[in-house]
């Protein structure tokens, strides 16, 4: 594993790695720090949480987010890392992606975002401003759907 360092003008320290205690801990970190997800792409967009624990006909999505390019992001968190489990998770996410648009057709996504902001103590105005920085609200949700 590569090391991660904390570097300041007068200090250089290797950060210790630590396993997550539970799936929920990792799931909560992706909610609290969605900017970590933007490190995985070339986009500078910070994803916005639509909702966590979203029930659909094929299961339950751990975290459902969207970036400011109107690209949906589905997160499924698993504790262990092995080849068979990775295959299962990929299949699970493909099932979710194929059914989500039909299952959530009645969902008011902006209301869900506001509800999630309140649940997790985020500034809903700042979150929505971030979300709509590239498109007007109506255009954004048209692209999203």
Model-derived segments and their meaning:
Residues 1-145:
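Charged, terminal alpha-helix-loop-beta segments
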């Amino acid at each position: 594993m590569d090391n991660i360092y904390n570097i300041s003008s007068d200090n250089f320290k290797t950060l210790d790695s630590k396993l997550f205690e539970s799936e929920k801990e990792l799931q909560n970190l992706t909610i609290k720090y969605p900017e970590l997800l933007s490190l995985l792409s070339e986009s500078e967009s910070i994803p916005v949480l639509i909702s966590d624990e979203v029930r659909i006909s094929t299961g339950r999505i751990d975290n459902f987010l969207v970036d400011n390019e109107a690209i949906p992001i589905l997160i499924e968190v698993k504790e262990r890392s092995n080849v068979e489990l990775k295959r299962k998770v990929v299949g699970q996410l493909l099932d979710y992606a194929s059914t989500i648009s039909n299952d959530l057709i009645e969902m008011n996504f902006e209301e869900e975002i506001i509800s999630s902001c309140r649940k997790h103590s985020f500034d809903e105005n700042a979150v929505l401003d971030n979300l709509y920085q590239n498109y007007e609200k109506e255009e954004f949700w048209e692209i999203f759907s």
